[in-house]
Amino acid sequence: MKVIYIYLLLLLVCKFLFVKSSCSLKVGKIECTKELETFLLYNETVVNVKMDTNGVKYYFNALEFPYKNLLCDLNIDIKFTPEIPSFPNIPTTGGDFGFTFNFPCDYRRRVKRIEIERTILSLSFDTSKNQFVTYLNPGCGPFNISSSGIQILSTTYETGAIPNVPILDDDKGILTIQGSNLYNTSIKIYSNNILKDTNPSGALDASHSSVTFSAEEFLTPNNWTIEVSICGSFYKSYSFPYFPKLDKMEGVLNDNGGNMVFTGKHLRPKHNVTGTFGNKTIECLTSNSSKSITCTIPSRKNYGFLGYDIPVTITIDGEYKSNTIKISYDLPLIQSVSQRGNSQIFDVTGVYFSGVKNMTVITGKNMKTDIIQKKTATLEEPGFFIESNYTIFIFLPNNTQPGFMNLVVGDGGSETFTSPRYNFKITPTITAGQTFNSTTSGNDLEIKGIFMRTVDSDGRDVPLTVNSGSGGLVCNPLKDGDGLLFTCVLGPGFGSSHTMNVYYNLIPIGSFTVSYNPPYLGTSEQEKDGTIKMNGKDLGESVKDSIMTVVYSDGNTVNGTVIKSSHTSLIFRYPIGNRNTASYIFQLGDQKSNKAGPFTLKPIIENTDPAVPCGGGVVTINGHYFFNYTKDTTTITIGKVPCNISSISETTIECVIVPNLRSLSPYYTSGTKPLVISSSNPGTEKVYQLTPAGLNYKFAPPTITNTSAIDQTALITIYGTSFGDANLEILINDKPCTQPEINIHTYSSLTCNVTNYDEMKIYNYSNTKFNISISVDGQYFIADIFQFKYESGIIYSENKSTGFPNEMYLGFVVFVIFIALISFAAKNQIEKYFEERKSRKAFRSLDNLRLKLRQKHATEIAKHYTFGEQSAPKPDKSTFYDIRKKLSRLPLIRRCFKEHTD
C-alpha cells in the first residue's frame, strides 16, 4: 500500500515538474519559448498545443483554444477572466443546472469562486459532460452571476404565464389561477361592496403551476374585478360578473304544487331570496349552497293559467336577479317525433303520456286530422297507442300532407287541456319496384306512395322533382293526388330502361323505372330528292341516336343515313348501291324496330325543268335509283323528240337531242313537253310519278346576248342561245329581218337581212339604237331588250394617186362572178326541168359547198363569241368573205338554196 502512495506522489511531482508552462505575458500577449507547449487541463488531461508563429516568436491564443472550458490560469502572472457563454432556462421552481464555465480554475487548478448577489454558488464538476453544476433556489426576476466583482452572466428566471381565465368557485369561496412559473403571484379584489380582505394570500403548489386564493366575499353573488400580478408586476385584470343563474327545476311539478328545488350557479344569498312564478310572487328558502335553492310553487288551480312553459326568476338580496327558465305542471308534453323508416308509423316520445285521450295532426293552413286512440297497436287503420308514460305509437293516414306538422295531445285529466304543439316533418315515400311504359312522345305517369300531398306547413306547394340525372329525362309533376299517388308528365325520350329519381325538397325519396316503347316501322314513301320517308310509331326525335339498316335479300346489310326524325315518321338517305329492293330495320338507342318490307325503290326524277336546248344538245336528267336502266334497253323522248342516251348512272341520265333540222321543226317547238323514259327490260321499274300530271320538260326559249353591226349589204349577225328555225321570226324595230340563216353547229348565232335598211340610212348612224325581238313557233320571246349601234361602212373612197382604185378591181371581179353564176343558175333550171335527178346531184354538191362555208363561218364566230357584254366579232374583211356574203344575198341563189333544202 505504501508503494502505491509513493508512486502517486512521484507522478504528481513529475507532472508539476514536467508539465509546467514556459509562457509569459508580454505587452498583453502570451509569449512562449517553444512552438509546442504542454498544458494540464482541469480534468487531469494533458494536451500538446502548437503555438501561433510570428517570426521566431511563439504566441498562445487562449480565446481560440478549443478546451478553454477546462483551461486553468497558466501561472501566477497569466490569469484568465472566467466566462459563462450561456445558461439553461431557469423556471421559478429553481433546481440543479449544468452549464459551461470557461477558464474555471487558477494556476493551482482550484475552481474560481462565482456568486449571486454576494451569495457564493456551490459548484460541482460533471466529468461525463465536462460541465459544472450548481443548485438555484426558487425565485423570479433577474438572475446575474459575477466573479471577483466582474459580472459574467446576466439572464432572468422564466416569466410567469396564465393562459386561461382563473376559476372562481363561489360554492367554496376559492379563486384558482393556473399557469406556469407562478412564483410570487398575488391578486387584488375590487367590488361595489365593501370587502374585508382585498389582497388575500395565495397558496402556491410545488410546480408553480397553480395558486389558490380564499376569500369570504367569493361566496355570494357580486360583480368582481380581480387584478393579478406576477413577481411584483401587473399581469392582467379579470372580470367575474357572478350573478345568480337558474338551470332547471328538479323533480315533477304536479297539480298541487309545493316546494321545488332549482339548480344553477351563484344562488347563495347573504340575506334573502325572492322569486316570481309567471305573474305571481313566490317565496324561496335561504341555502348554504350556491348551486341550488328551494322555492314554493302554487297549485295549478291557484295559479289559474295554462300549465305549460311558466317563467320562473329569483332575486338575491334584492339586488341580483337571475335569468328566466320555464317550467310546466306534469301535463303531457311531446319532446320528439321520429318516423320508422319510410312507413306510416311514428314514434312519439315525451312525458306524462299515460293519461292522453286524444291526438290531432295539424297540417297546411290549419287542416286538422284527428287520430283515435287504440287499445292495441294496429297497422290496419290510423290511430295511436300509448306504449308507456314516455312513448306513443302513431299510425298516420297515408294522405297526410308532408312537410312540417303540428301534433296536439290532450291531457286526459278532469280539466280540458291541450298540450303545446310539436312541429315535426313527414317526407313522402315512393313505393318501391314501380315500372312504366311510355311512347317516345311521353306520357302521364301515376306514381304510387304514401304522404304524396306535396304541401308544406304553410299550405304552399312543395314540388316533387323527378329526373334521371343531370341532362337526363324529366317528369314534370302535376297537382298532387289523394296522398297515395301523384301524376307527372314524362317528356319525350327513348330507351329500354331509365331510372327516375324522385326528390322532395331536394331530398331523395325513391325511384321508379321507365321504358319507352320500341320503334315500329310501317309504310314507306319516296321523296323527290331521293330520300325515303318511313311512317311508323315511336320513332323518336333524336337523329344522332338513330340508325337505319337496309337489309338485302341475300342477308347483306348496309346503313342508311337518318336526316330527320319525328315520333311518327322519319326520313333517311338510301345507301349508295345497285340494288333497289330491300327491307328496313330502325334502331333508336338500344331498341330495334320490326323488319319492314321488302320495298322496291322506283326511279325518281329530281329536275323536272332542265331547260332542253331548242337547237339540240345534251340533256341531263338528275334523279335517283336508275339501277336497272341501261343504254341498250332504255329510250327517252321529250314530246316527240327522241333523246339519244349517252350515259346512265344511279343518279344521272345524259342524252343528246339531234340538231334542229327543218324536217324535224314541228317537234322542236317551245314550251312544255312530256318526258317519257321507257325500258324494254320487264324487270325495270317505271319512273315514279310524284304528281298525276306526270313529268314535263321545257324547251328553252331563245335569248339574245349580242349583235354585230349592219354591213353594207344590210346583213346583221345576232348572237344568243336556242336559235331553232321552226317558224322563226326576227323583228328589228317591229320590222322583219328576213332570210335568217342559223349556225346549225352551235345554234348560238344567226344572220338575217334588215328589210328597213334604206329607211335607216336617213338617221345619224353613229347614234341610232334599235330594238330586236325573236319568236319561235309563232310565239314571241323577249329575253331582254337588246340595242345595237349602227356603224356605216365606206362603200367607195377616192384615191388621189393615178390608176384605178382597189374597189374598181373588186367590182370587176364580182361582176364577172355574178355573170358566171347567172349562167350557171339558168343552166340548172333547164336541166332541172328536163333531167331532175341529174340536177339534184349537181345541187347536192353545191349544198355541200354551202355547208363547208357555213362551218368555217361558225368556227370563226366561236373563236370570238362569248356571252355577256363582249362585243360581237368584227366582220371578215377579206376579199373572199365579201364575195361569199354578196353571193348569199342574190335572190335567185337564195331561192335555189331554199328549194334544195325543202
From Swiss-Prot:
Molecular function terms, GO-annotated: transmembrane signaling receptor activity
Cytoplasmic side: 825-902
Secretion signal, residue range per the UniProt entry: 1-24
Transmembrane segments: 804-824
Any one Pfam family match given in the protein's UniProt record, by short name: TIG
Tagged with keyword Transferase: no
One GO CC term, this protein: external side of plasma membrane
GO biological process, one term: cell-cell self recognition
Extracellular compartment spans: 25-803
Disrupted-gene phenotype: TgrB1 and tgrC1 double mutants show strain segregation in chimeras with wild-type cells.
Protein topology in the membrane: Single-pass type I membrane protein
Residues with attached carbohydrate: 43, 144, 184, 223, 272, 279, 288, 358, 389, 398, 437, 559, 628, 644, 706, 753, 764, 771, 799
Domain of life: Eukaryota
Record's keyword terms, sorted: Cell membrane, Glycoprotein, Membrane, Repeat, Signal, Transmembrane, Transmembrane helix
Domain IPT/TIG residue range list: 249-323, 603-680, 704-788
InterPro entries the UniProt entry points to: Dictyostelium_Tiger, Ig-like_fold, Ig_E-set, IPT_dom
Subcellular locations according to the entry: Cell membrane
Note, other: The tgrB1 gene is highly polymorphic.
Function: tgrB1 and tgrC1 are involved in kin discrimination. They play an essential role in aggregation and subsequent development.
Name this protein carries in UniProt: Tiger protein B1
Natural source organism: Dictyostelium discoideum
Gene: tgrB1
